[in-house]
């Protein structure tokens, strides 16, 4: 099997491997005798993903909003570090970009790109097609609360976190006509390594409930997420923004 890890991807894996041990460090006791909250938590999250591949969520005809929802659970080690596992499912619709429509590209039933319709073969103009993508994310992230680095904000109800993540991502793309959603090509399930980072802002509503928003990028290795031939466009990534609702479990320790 071809090795999809580039130098940048290896660097991200090494960075996570470097950061994770620090996440297990015991919270330091501050001068006022307080420490950051420690303990287990779970939550739900939902967002709107946008896909960028040969086709794009920002297509030639309109912008198409995707949706995603999932569960997460993790452990907060101190006021700076937490780590979590998550699972999420979502769907998107992507269509051709302006440049591909202007060049009058066609997709043949053999999955290849053509500059015109092909005699004796079913083929479709890019301008008339969209890719319906179903996705699953399964992975881990480390949250680094930047406000926890400063004494004045370490125990604030607010947090501002940078969250590197690594996912195993599944995609399955069916090619459909825009006009009537007729399926012209059925896709197969592909597995990808997904890597990237989120920026999160959260607020502790009560001792148990936390509300947050997030936005981040995830790059995918391997096959095109949209099931289209790779030509000109090298992009293969997601941009997702959404909300999170977390619950501190009863056996969380507040020190």
How would you name each of these model-derived features?
Residues 1-32, 36, 142:
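Bacterial Sec-dependent N-terminal signal peptides
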Residues 14, 24-43, 151-160, 250-255:
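Outer-membrane beta-barrel biogenesis signature
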Residues 26-74, 171-173:
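Short glycine/proline- and aromatic-enriched beta-strand/turn motifs that initiate or cap beta-hairpins
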Residues 28-29, 77-178, 249:
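Gram-negative (and chloroplast) outer-membrane scaffold detector with strong preference
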Residues 34-42, 79-81, 136-138, 154-162, ...:
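Outer-envelope beta-barrel architecture signal
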Residues 38, 63-69, 132-138, 156-158, ...:
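Residues that define the transmembrane beta-barrel architecture of outer-membrane proteins
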Residues 44-48, 71-75, 140-146, 164-168, ...:
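Residues on the lipid-exposed face of transmembrane beta-strands in outer-membrane beta-barrel proteins
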Residues 54-59, 124-131, 180-187, 225-233:
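Extracellular loop and loop/strand-boundary signature of outer-membrane beta-barrel proteins
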């Amino acid at each position: 099997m071809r090795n999809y890890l580039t130098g940048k991807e290896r660097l991200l894996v090494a960075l996570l491997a470097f950061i994770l041990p620090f996440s297990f460090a015991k919270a330091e006791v501050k001068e006022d005798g307080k420490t950051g909250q420690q303990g287990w938590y779970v939550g739900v999250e939902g967002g709107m993903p946008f896909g960028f591949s040969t086709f794009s969520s920002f297509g030639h005809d309109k912008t198409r909003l995707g949706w995603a929802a999932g569960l997460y659970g993790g452990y907060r080690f101190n006021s700076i570090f937490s780590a979590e596992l998550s699972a999420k499912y979502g769907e998107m619709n992507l269509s051709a970009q302006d440049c591909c429509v202007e060049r009058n590209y066609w997709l043949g039933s053999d999955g290849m790109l053509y500059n015109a319709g092909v005699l004796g073969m079913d083929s479709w103009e890019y301008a008339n097609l969209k890719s319906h993508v179903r996705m699953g994310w399964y992975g881990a992230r480390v949250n680094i609360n930047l406000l926890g680095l400063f004494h004045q904000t370490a125990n604030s109800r607010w947090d501002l976190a940078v969250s590197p993540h690594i996912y195993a991502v599944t995609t399955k793309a069916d090619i459909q006509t825009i006009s009537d959603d007729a399926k012209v090509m059925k896709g197969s399930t592909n597995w990808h390594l997904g890597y990237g980072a989120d920026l999160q802002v959260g607020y502790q509503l009560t001792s148990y409930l936390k509300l947050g928003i997030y936005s981040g990028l995830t790059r995918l290795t391997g096959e095109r997420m949209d099931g289209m031939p790779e030509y000109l466009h090298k992009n293969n990534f997601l941009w997702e923004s959404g909300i999170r609702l977390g619950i501190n479990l009863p056996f969380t320790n507040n020190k």
